[in-house]
From Swiss-Prot:
It comes from Brachypodium pinnatum (Tor grass). Belongs to the complex I subunit 5 family. It holds the Pfam family Proton_antipo_C. This is NAD(P)H-quinone oxidoreductase subunit 5, chloroplastic. NDH shuttles electrons from NAD(P)H:plastoquinone, via FMN and iron-sulfur (Fe-S) centers, to quinones in the photosynthetic chain and possibly in a chloroplast respiratory chain. The immediate electron acceptor for the enzyme in this species is believed to be plastoquinone. Couples the redox reaction to proton translocation, and thus conserves the redox energy in a proton gradient. GO terms for biological process: ATP synthesis coupled electron transport; electron transport coupled proton transport. Keywords: Chloroplast, Membrane, NAD, NADP, Plastid, Plastoquinone, Quinone, Thylakoid, Translocase, Transmembrane, Transmembrane helix, Transport. NDH is composed of at least 16 different subunits, 5 of which are encoded in the nucleus. It catalyses: a plastoquinone + NADH + (n+1) H(+)(in) = a plastoquinol + NAD(+) + n H(+)(out); a plastoquinone + NADPH + (n+1) H(+)(in) = a plastoquinol + NADP(+) + n H(+)(out).
Amino acid sequence: HFQNYSSTKEGSLYSISLWGNRIPKGVNKDFVLSTTKSEVSFFSQNISISKGQGNTRNRTGSFSTSFGSKNVFTYPHETGNTMLFPLLILLLFTFFIGFIGIPFDNRTMDNGIVRLTILSKWLIPSINFTQESSNFSINSYEFITNAISSVSLAILGLFIAYIFYGSAYSFFQNLDLQNSFYKGSPKKNFFYQVKKKIYSWSYNRGYIDIFYSX
C-alpha cells in the first residue's frame, strides 16, 4: 500500500521592480532528490508484521515530502565577461598611471622649478631628499585625505550596485530593500513618476549590454 504525504503551497506573488512596476516572481528553485518532480523520497523499507502463527504480511512504507517552489526577487542581469575583462584592463592602466603621477614637493633643477612625481624620482638620480621630509609628509597627508574620500564614494557605489545587481541568495535580497521604498502609495510619489519617465526613455537605449548579449 503506497501513500504519498505531500503538500504544495503556491501563491501569486508580485514584486516591485526598480522602476515601480509589478513583476511576478517567476524564478523557481525546485529541490529534487529523486525522479519525482514535486516530491522528495527519504526512505522506503519493507516491514514484516506477524499476525498469529504463520500469518505474515509485507507492507511497503513510502515516506516522502515535497519542497515548494522558492520565489526570489527578480533583479536586473549582471554584466557579462565581455564587459568585465576590458574594465579590468583599464583598471590596471589607470592604477599604474595614477600611482606614478602622484605629485610630490618641488625640486630646483637647471631648467627651473619642476614638479616631481614618483616616475621622475625613479628616472632622475636623487642626491639628498632628507631635507624635504616635512614637505613630503604634508603632501602625503593631502593625498591620503583625497584618496579616502574618492575610495569611500567608490565603495558606496559598489554597495548600492551589489544591492540591485547582487546574487538572488544574498542577505540584502532577503531584506527586500527595494520594495521598502515603495510602500504606501508609490504612484503618488514624484520620484516614482520621474523614474517611470526615465525608464520609458532608456528602455533599449541606455543599456549597452544588449549588444553584447545578442
